[in-house]
C-alpha cells in the first residue's frame, strides 16, 4: 500500500493570507502565529502576501481571487466571529465556511479555514495564543502540508 501525505517544509512555497479586520485584537494575533509558523518552516518573508478584508463575510471572495491567480501554493483565511444576541453570527459563520470551502474546491488550491467561531470573547482569546494554542499557527502548518501534498499529486 502506498502512503501519500504532505510534509511541513515550506521552502519554495508562496502563501497568501486573507485576514479580517473585524475583531483585529484577535485576528492580529492569529496572523502573528501564522507568519511565525510559516517562517519557522522555511517559507521566506517575501513569499508571504497578506490581504486585509473588512470582516469574515468578505474573506471567501478575496481567498478565491488569490487562489485563482495560481501564484500561491496555498491560501490561509483568518478571522474571528463571536456570537452575539442575534442570528447574524450563524449567517456569517455558515457563509464564510461555505465560501472558503468553495474557493478551494473551485480552484484546486488549498484554502485553509482559520476562522474562529466562538461563543465568547474569552474563547477567541484562548484560541489566539493562550490556553488553546494559536489557531493561526495551526492553519499555517496545515497550509504547508496541504500545499506539499497537492504538489505531490500533480
UniProtKB/Swiss-Prot annotation:
The keyword Nucleotidyltransferase does not apply. It comes from Bacillus licheniformis (strain ATCC 14580 / DSM 13 / JCM 2505 / CCUG 7422 / NBRC 12200 / NCIMB 9375 / NCTC 10341 / NRRL NRS-1264 / Gibson 46). It comes from the Bacteria. GO terms for biological process: riboflavin biosynthetic process. Keywords: Riboflavin biosynthesis, Transferase. It catalyses: (2S)-2-hydroxy-3-oxobutyl phosphate + 5-amino-6-(D-ribitylamino)uracil = 6,7-dimethyl-8-(1-D-ribityl)lumazine + phosphate + 2 H2O + H(+). Forms an icosahedral capsid composed of 60 subunits, arranged as a dodecamer of pentamers. One of its GO terms (cellular component) is cytosol. This is 6,7-dimethyl-8-ribityllumazine synthase. Pfam families: DMRL_synthase. The gene is ribH. Its EC number is 2.5.1.78. 5-amino-6-(D-ribitylamino)uracil binds at residues 22, 56-58, 80-82, 113. PANTHER family: 6,7-DIMETHYL-8-RIBITYLLUMAZINE SYNTHASE, 6,7-DIMETHYL-8-RIBITYLLUMAZINE SYNTHASE DMRL SYNTHASE LUMAZINE SYNTHASE. Catalyzes the formation of 6,7-dimethyl-8-ribityllumazine by condensation of 5-amino-6-(D-ribitylamino)uracil with 3,4-dihydroxy-2-butanone 4-phosphate. This is the penultimate step in the biosynthesis of riboflavin. (2S)-2-hydroxy-3-oxobutyl phosphate binds at residues 85-86, 127.
